Amino acid sequence: MKFATKLSLGCIALLSCALGAAGLLLTGQSFSGSLASTRTALQAQQEKEKYALERIIFQATDSAQFENYILASAAQQYAEQTADAGSSMALWLDGAYTLYSGLPAALPRTALKQALTNGENAWQLTRAAGRWYLLLTQPLDLPGVRADMLCAYDVSAVFATRDAQLRAWLA
């Protein structure tokens, strides 16, 4: 081969690699932005859910004592009133005991415990049964009780969009 042909093929290969890398970078940035905006929206939603659950708990009792059955009943009542296919919740006591859980059974208990350990304003992605879940924890403001609201939001659509973009780019 002549030098000019080799140079042309080398430039084409280099340009192809550069365009491929740029496409993957743009797809990654798009995914990161989409996941961040979804997470922010879900954190705001969870904050509203926390206040609504606290209101139900305070309405369920006339005393400052919060019995476990009252907490569990209030959590179940709230979950039934606000049932949504893309989200579910659990109420944990002292970070160790589940008082109520409407979470998907496929979510591993170790992931749930880790989300509780991470605490407020932390988030965790977990994959279970072919779905991606964003786990968020909020402590409830109840006097004398350490109760946490753990929510699992199905964010599989964000990952499906990313996968479709990658397939389109690589096709």
Give the residues covered by each predicted segment.
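Juxtamembrane segments flanking the first transmembrane helix
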Residues: M1-D94
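Hydrophobic, aromatic-rich alpha-helical transmembrane segments
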Residues: A4, S8-I12, T161-L166, L170
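Exposed alpha-helical structural elements
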Residues: Q65, I70-A74, L107-Q114, A157
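Extracellular/periplasmic ligand-sensing ectodomains of membrane signal-transduction proteins
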Residues: G86-Q114
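Membrane-proximal, non-catalytic sensory/regulatory domains of signal-transducing membrane proteins
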Residues: L103-D148
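Internal alpha-helical transmembrane segments of multipass membrane proteins
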Residues: N121, L170-A171
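Helix-start (N-cap) segments at beta->loop->alpha junctions
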Residues: L140-V145, L150-W169
